[in-house]
Amino acid sequence: MDIERVEQVRAVERLAHRRGLALMPRAGLAAADFVAARLPAGAQVLALAGPGNNGGDALVAATLLQARGYRVAVVMPAGPARLPDDARRAWQDWCAAGGQASADLPAHAPALVIDGLFGIGLARPLGGAWQGLIDQVNAWRVPVLALDVPSGLSAASGQPLGDPPGRPVRATWTLSFIGVPAALRAPGAAAWCGQQHLSLLGLTPAFLAEAVGPCGQATATAARRSGP
């Protein structure tokens, strides 16, 4: 079945958590495989890791790509102090692999950027510092892989966040996990999302259907009634 609303994605995530399924390693692997299919080993990759689980996905991808021979740099403007648990584990794995992070963008553009700053949960306008960083990334005009949604774009409306609207990451590709919110398929979103791709993270249609309920409505009860 198609997952087309943010609340449906959240319902799937809740059920996965209830079942003990770790989705972040799967998302990071999907992102790393996506990059590896389009960029030769040894190339420079910059992973932008934000303060939430989207940043954790980017950190997993960074760790895997470094292990495959890519030259990977990580930029974490907000630092690791307030990362949620799963993302913190991804940060610890990155550090254990010898990785470091900077708060600032490098002086020179990489071959490819992974945008893991903000995901589908972002509902507020970007602040000035975040907007400045995104503007610099866009000015590089290098390929950008956005995870879930280009940072600064509303997954609910498909429009840039803010009034006046901000300037989201301009992605070459957007790799959505579990489902693609319908708003991201709207014509106005295409300029920011680039080519749309979807990874189901190995979840079966039956699992997705159970998570969102018999009528396709995302409900917490689907997660609550399922044992581990």
Curated annotation (Swiss-Prot):
Entry binding sites for (6S)-NADPHX: 53-57, 119-125, 148
Essential cofactor(s): K(+)
A molecular function (GO) term: NAD(P)HX epimerase activity
Domain of life: Bacteria
Annotated residues for binding of K(+): 54, 115, 151
Co-factor remark: Binds 1 potassium ion per subunit.
Assigned EC number: 5.1.99.6
Catalytic activity, reaction form: (6R)-NADHX = (6S)-NADHX; (6R)-NADPHX = (6S)-NADPHX
Intrachain S-S bonds: none
Chain ranges of the YjeF N-terminal domain: 9-209
InterPro entries in alphabetical order: YjeF_N_dom, YjeF_N_dom_sf
Pfam family, one: YjeF_N
Family note: Belongs to the NnrE/AIBP family.
Function: Catalyzes the epimerization of the S- and R-forms of NAD(P)HX, a damaged form of NAD(P)H that is a result of enzymatic or heat-dependent hydration. This is a prerequisite for the S-specific NAD(P)H-hydrate dehydratase to allow the repair of both epimers of NAD(P)HX.
Name of the protein: NAD(P)H-hydrate epimerase
Native species: Bordetella bronchiseptica (strain ATCC BAA-588 / NCTC 13252 / RB50)
Gene expressing this chain: nnrE
